[in-house]
Structure formats: structure tokens, C-alpha cells
Amino acid sequence: GYRLLLCNSDESLKREKELIDDLLSYKIAALLIVPVDGDEGSNKEYLDHIRSTGTPVVCVDREIEGIHCDGVYIDNYTACYEVTKDVLTRGYRNIAYMADPPIYRPGCDRLRGFRDACKEFGVTVPQENIFLAPIEDTKSLNAFLHDVARRDVPPKAIINFVRGWDYTMLQALHSAGLRVPEDVYLTGLDDDNTLPNFGYSMQYLPSVIDFSEAAAKLLIERVEAGNALPEPERRIFTTHMKPIFERKVTLPKPDAAPTEADEKEK
């Protein structure tokens, strides 16, 4: 068997490098990493160097441009496109979008999926309804949520791709007297298992477990390959997302007529 060592870089490029150095001092068999890649840059050259010395490196979720390491990634574009299309199909036009800024590859792909779905439906979402900031910027996140919740006409749907959003969002909506999902239809990624409390949930395919197992299996394959590592492999999981309603719920009145597909679902 293997012993698993866990570390958290807190999105710090310097800390990530220090942690990797510390792990290498234990003569680790391989490195599984969600790499830092943003305003500070990335440790791309260092990760490539580690792999070149014979230590397998498998990147997960966040793809660094031009990296020469194995990677297992989620198709963030399709996921966000399908979530946005679901909202627009239900007839909602006054919507809000929350996500990480388009600095990392996932943020870029998600924003592109959102915009492409809106373009397909001929919908223009005003900039004041779009929040793009890292999860660490809790002050801006709170300000945005309280602003949209207290407008004369608040959004009828909020598409969220920011991690750890359950408590902050629900608190903002509740303080403004808004109900979920009767007044605001919440949807998106990483809902921290909040939505089932309101009678529905988001189904992710592949599941987090399936995705994690794929990354672990690739890592083991590389460890068992020894020093003769094959060319890096880039595995992309096409991700599908859709709401699953566990019971009959009342959603906000649509701004436009729902499409035929949504009418059949109901």
C-alpha cells in the first residue's frame, strides 16, 4: 500500500513550491496536485522538472497551459453551458452569474459556457449581475449577494460556480425576505449539499468519486511504470449537469415562455 500525505497551498505559489519541496524530501513515489495558476503565475517549469527526474506528476482540475505532465480534468465548459441552458430553458431572463475570475482555465471555460448559452438564447446579462472574484474575496461576495437580493426586481435565478457558497448566499436571500426556490432558483456547482433541503439537487456526471478514482488510477499507473514514464496523457471528462427534483417544488414565475423540453419535464 501507499501512505498519503495531504497539503494545502491556499492558492499561494510560494507556499506550493515550499510544500512540494517538503514532500520531495520524504522521497514520495508520485505527486497528485491541483496546481496554482493565476496572477502570481505557476510552478509549471518546476513540475515539469520533477517529472523529468522520474517522479510522476498528475495535475487535477486546473490545467496549466503548456505543462508537460499528466492531467485529469473536468469539462467545465459543458457543465456551465448546460446549467445556464437549463435556467434559460425554464424561461428565466433576469439571472445572475457567480464564478471564479477567468484567470485559471476552469474560470475561463465556465464563463465561455455561460456566455455561449446566453448568446444561443439571445439573452444579454448586465454586468451588474455578473460576479467574478476568487472565493477568498468574501467581502465582495457578500456585497454582491446583498445587492442583488435587495433590488426592486431581484434575479429569479442565480447560477453559481463559486465553492462554499451555501451559507453566505442563503443568509443574503433570507435577510431580504426571498425564498428558495419559490422566489429564487439556485443552481450551479459545489452547492455543499445545500439544495436537497429545498427539494432538488444538481446531478454531476461523472461523479466526484468517479473523477477522483480516475486520477488515482492514472497516478498508480505512472508509479508502476517505474522510471520509464510514458508521454504525458491529458484525460478530459465530459461533464454533464442537470437538476433532479426529489419532490414537487414551486419555482419563480418565468420571464419568458419555457421551451417545449422544459414543459415536458414538468
Locate the predicted segments by residue:
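Short, solvent-exposed amphipathic alpha-helices that sit
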Residues: 1, 18, 79-83, 105-124, ...
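Alpha-helical recognition/docking segments in bacterial nutrient-uptake
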Residues: 1-85, 149-150
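Short beta-strand elements in bilobed, periplasmic/extracellular small-molecule ligand-binding domains
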Residues: 1-8, 97, 115-138
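Periplasmic-binding protein-like
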Residues: 23, 28-37, 96-98, 152-164, ...
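Hydrophobic alpha-helical segments within soluble ligand-binding/sensing domains
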Residues: 70-97, 112-116, 138-146, 166, ...
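An alpha-beta-alpha
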Residues: 81-121, 231-250
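Short acidic capping loops at alpha-helix termini that bridge into adjacent secondary structure
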Residues: 93-94, 125-129, 179-185
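Flexible loop/turn connectors
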Residues: 145-265
